[in-house]
Every structure is written in C-alpha cells, then in structure tokens.
C-alpha cells in the first residue's frame, strides 16, 4: 500500500524570510498528514558510544544533555502548537532516542529495526534492519491519514 509521501526535513541556517516560508510550507505539509517523519535524537554530546555500551543500561550510553532535553520538549511543542496529528511514534532502543521520543511525544514503541548500525559492533545487522524497516513501512496501515514518526 502506497501510503506515505516521503518528507525529508533538513534544518539549515537561512535568512529569516526564507526560513519563514520554508517553515510555513513544512507545517502545511505535516498538517496534511500521511507523512513519514524521521527525527534524529535530540542533542547528546559526543559521537558513537563507549566500548562498554550495553543496550539495556543507559549509564553505558551517550544520553541527552539538558540542552537535548530542551530540544526534545521543543519538538513536542512544535507538533502541538501546529496541531500536527501523529498516529504512532517509533523509537530505536538506544536510550537517547527513547528519551527524545518520550519527552517530545510521551507515547512511543521501540523497534529494533531503528537501532543504529553505525559502529562495526552492529554493522552485521544492517541488511536485516533495513529490510524490516521497509517491510514495516510497506505494511503500515493508517486509516486517519496521520503522520508516523521514527526516532
């Protein structure tokens, strides 16, 4: 089922008038619904994860800073302020992604196919995850034409 119009959101620094036009256009697109919205986790200082990384232990991961928590709140406020309908929020199992989803949208479900395969430790999962993500999107049913958010 071809449900989604794909929308790529890129935040760049532009002049105020261009940003206002882009922002209005973006809001209009999201208000229409039926979009697949990819959101990267909010600010978590550094890159990658420590060598002792454990998916089930947030203390071994890079987590949101206070600035990141404020960013996540701002994301949620943006959707509420603009009355952008969300059907479902899916997050990877990484703590910074779950925390972003929780702060911004409150309700979310984790899906391992959204997990990072950035490091060599997880690269072996890439093909399986991409296939599962494509399958999920292909079979996703949304009768209310709301948006699907992936963090």
Name every feature range the model reports, one short phrase each.
Residues 1, 25-26, 137:
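Hydrophobic alpha-helical segments, principally membrane-spanning helices and signal/leader peptides
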Residues 3-14:
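Sec-dependent N-terminal signal peptides
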Residues 13, 29, 82, 141-142:
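Generic structural signal for beta-strand residues in well-ordered domains
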Residues 130-134:
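Internal catalytic or translocation cores that form aromatic/hydrophobic pockets or channels
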Residues 137-151:
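Active-site-adjacent alpha-helix immediately C-terminal to a catalytic or transition-state-stabilizing loop
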């Amino acid at each position: 089922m071809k449900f989604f119009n794909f929308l790529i959101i890129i935040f760049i620094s532009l002049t105020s008038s261009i940003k206002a036009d882009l922002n209005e256009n973006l809001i209009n697109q999201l208000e229409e619904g039926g979009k697949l919205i990819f959101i990267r986790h909010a600010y978590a200082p550094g890159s990658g994860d420590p060598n002792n990384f454990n998916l089930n232990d947030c203390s071994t991961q890079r987590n949101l800073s206070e600035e990141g928590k404020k960013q996540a709140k701002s994301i949620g406020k943006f959707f509420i302020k603009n009355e952008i309908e969300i059907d479902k929020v899916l997050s990877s199992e990484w703590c910074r992604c779950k925390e972003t989803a929780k702060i911004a949208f409150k309700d979310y479900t984790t899906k391992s196919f959204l997990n990072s395969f950035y490091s060599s430790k997880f690269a072996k999962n890439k093909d399986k995850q991409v296939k599962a993500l494509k399958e999920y999107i292909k079979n996703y049913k949304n009768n209310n034409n709301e948006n699907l958010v992936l963090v």
